[in-house]
């Protein structure tokens, strides 16, 4: 029985081996089929084949187990003996694993198998393991091949896509090229039409140029005819009696060619220049006062001096000389555009050996075309500019000659109104002869009055301003609003580098009053100064210091702390008080001026004496002073007396001060003021330098000129 069971196990093992071999053969066949199928199509993979083979092996093992169970039910005695043999077979069939050591011990204890059989089993197991390893390696290879195939397929797909894209791009490019060709083909008729239009335009330009040249020729002929007529009128040309009845158009044919007329014009202008040089080098007597010089100057201004040439055989010597030279022109020896072997065409300067070559060059290079006509137009513009310049220079020369022929004229009053403030004091000689001694007054060195050397001028009522305007001068000056002065001259002050005739305090107040909320910061005041006046766009350090000084100095400017910072406002009441103080005179200015009760009468006498000594024939000659001028002098005296009375009423006189003789200089101060009436271009105010109003006014008017503080 033991031998039979051993033989059964061996047979079973052989069967198992055969089964495994069959399985391996099936797997090999499946793998071959898988390869062939993988080569032919990628629908069935090797993984699915392996799963199928394993399922087939499991089904075969299950069938064997069922057969053994049915046989065990039929013979229960033999089933007990076969159980230990069935376990390894079933295990080997179901799971192709190696026999465990426990199973080996059980087999040895039961002494079922002999050592040879065990060796055979071990060899079979080793063979099975080798087959399993081979299967695993084969499986790995299959996977690698599948991956490679997938990668190749992806690469092929990408290449195909790229090729398709390239083909599409090529097709698009071809389509674009075709479209461009079609457009070009469509545009060809348009180009032809454009070329035709250009040709037509060129033809029109050529026709216009011909017309233009004809007009130029006509204009030149007219100018020549007019010039001939003017020469005939001036006596330079004498036409024979037989030719007097010829029409105007026949003048060039009868007398001169265009080249001859040009040469004649050059010679006439040369004669004029020689005469002008003779006038300049010969010298002029500027001290003549007779009427003949004035009449000659007026005639020279009306028409330039012309020297009449002697007439020979009814024609001038100039014409004879010109006609002698015209024979050389006819031979071709000279040409306006040819000289010294060089073409004189503007911008050409090509060298021509002889006149014939020049004519060929002129006909070939400077024919009637666009370039030549353009150069002709440029030359016309050059001639026009030179004519304009020549006319200006002639006018200047005529004005110079007129000025030199005339006697020295008196200077005309400037259109800008001037305020002539004459602070007149007494000289040393008048102090010695005066019956009363005068106290010393503080004076500042000023420029003396320059004596006028011209003849005495008569003061007419039209040139004398109103006396009431003179008396209102000090009071009205401060009441004129600044906006009325800046508004009409806004653009002038904005663009011209001119110092505005206002104090810094007035300008600061104007800046604050122009703002919307009547308050400005310091930077905003600076920006208003630079925006309104071009003068303040330079020397910022100087005038900005003056602005800050005025803001801190005057009480009318109030500093207010705000959320944004410190702003400046104007106290209008304080500002008006300051103005009224300046109008009436500051007590500090009046305090230092000593006066006496008899000062007014002595000053009036000294004024007349000083004016008499200062080379002013207007005041020294009573015959030339009319009623208006005498009223003016009376108004001046009244102003002086009123100022003296004002000083005396304030009680600032110092009778204890000893009188000392002092030399006082006469000076005239010219300053721009605002004209009150358009009919009064001049305002003459003559006061003494002791007046408090004058001192206060001087402080206000000189304040804008001091850049350091105010």
From Swiss-Prot:
Subcellular locations according to the entry: Nucleus
Alphabetized InterPro entries for the sequence: FH_FOXP1_P2, Fork_head_dom, FOXP, FOXP-CC, TF_fork_head_CS_2, WH-like_DNA-bd_sf, WH_DNA-bd_sf
Family annotation (CDD domains): FH_FOXP2
Comp. bias intervals (Low complexity): 287-300, 433-454
Hydrolase is among the record's keywords: no
Record note on quaternary structure: Forms homodimers and heterodimers with FOXP1 and FOXP4. Dimerization is required for DNA-binding. Interacts with CTBP1. Interacts with FOXP1. Interacts with TBR1. Interacts with ZMYM2.
Note on domains (UniProt): The leucine-zipper is required for dimerization and transcriptional repression.
Protein name, entry field: Forkhead box protein P2
